Regions:
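Positively charged n-region of N-terminal signal peptides that target proteins for export
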Residues: 1-5
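Bacterial N-terminal signal peptides
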Residues: 7-16
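A beta-strand edge to alpha-helix "cap/lid" segment located at domain peripheries
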Residues: 21-49, 54-149
Length: 149
């Protein structure tokens, strides 16, 4: 009976510490999901607040800075119609976080419909109370690609 009670007590302590550690991770996952929606909606005002002034964006056809990325989204040169997120992983180290999303992206690029499998790497930095995106990189992958957790 004592061993069962000890096991349950240790399990609860471990479980509660896991939830405490994952609050920031959940915030980042939600922020990443919101970002996909804002990109789809072409909501450059919200994206402008999220993207750090020195943010970089790496696509299959080039690398852009913040203002260029916002203009591409605003004008619809790339329309991120829908990102279907299949898996997400988060790692936090100090005030820096990396979010990996395994997605299928439905987009319109130069008036052509494109459906592409990506693993997207997002780098965030905690600045005051807010997370700011420093980098976003699209890596084209096979549909069987999995993120290591």
């Amino acid at each position: 009976m004592k061993s069962i009670l000890l096991f349950v007590s240790l399990s609860l302590v471990t479980l509660s510490s896991t939830f405490a550690q994952s609050a920031e991770e959940q915030t980042l996952i939600q922020l990443s999901m919101d970002k996909w929606q804002w990109m789809s909606d072409k909501d450059v005002d919200k994206l402008d607040k999220l993207f750090d002034a020195k943010a970089k964006f790496v696509h299959m056809s080039g690398t852009w800075k913040k203002d260029e990325e916002l203009d591409i989204i605003k004008t619809g040169r790339i329309w991120y119609k829908k990102a279907t997120v299949k898996d997400t992983a988060v790692e936090i180290s100090g005030n820096t976080a990396i979010v990996w999303n395994r997605i299928t992206l439905d987009a319109v690029v130069r008036e052509q419909v494109a459906v592409t499998e990506f693993t997207v790497t997002e780098v965030y930095q905690k600045q005051g109370k807010d997370w700011k995106m420093l980098a976003l990189t699209f890596s084209s992958v096979r549909d069987t690609h999995q993120i290591k957790h």
